[in-house]
């Protein structure tokens, strides 16, 4: 079980809930990082008294350093600070809850030190899954997923001695706020509309990804990397209730599912305590009152991001980094009111069509593909 964490992305939704679980389990915090939220990170730092606090934005880091003077907490900035936080000797687990490809280098740094990775940053595996998984094997680092779907699959696979016994993975998807709408009906949807997720409380970027179904597309790629399966063996299924978090179908016809309330503290707690389970203070799922559980096929004509993700996964190389970088840039423009909802898949598809894919890429190739894809969208 985890004793001390370094938390990358402390002020986001996953980061805040991770600190709740850490407090509940008596887990120490060695490092906290964020992008630029000075007020909240100061509050968290004073409460958990980490050795290190990092703000990616240099100006914000200077302000935080002044506020924390006299506390004994070291303050760093930028990628250098993230790498330092991920590499702290006293942290046995690094929780990667930062958004986007910025989490890639710190995750690799933690892996190279053989730490447990509680992985909530799906972009790391989407962009550089083979590099990350090969490094984890080389350095003996354990990766425990925090995404509810991948945590569910991870739990269903406990006791599976041979991955060839798996016929397919079924990742469940709520369908988001626009379930049942046509592509034409989605044309005029605003950021405010997209941010009304029916079941989960998340940050704005992942909530928009859930509305476009890109989140599920990225999770398909993540599952391929985590479990070393071809894209054909990872599928998405609409499950509006968000009670069944994912399923694994085995070659003998058995189908295992993990069920629970839609609460991110469940997979966070599991990642912290694995291979054990800790008592939860929250009420468990009541099967007698949760109602009917339904399943449906996703509509890829209305939500083409799911198709684009599968196509990028099939191409391989830097295609997934292009997909991810273009999507992050397009979602950012949508949240600023500069793009329409359906322009997100249009811009992503344009980047995939126009950019050259590098096969067997280095880390530098992957990061450059990500940067170039963002530029192509702007």
Describe the predicted segments one by one:
Residues 1-378:
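Catalytic, metal-anchored helix/loop core of enzyme active sites in primary metabolism
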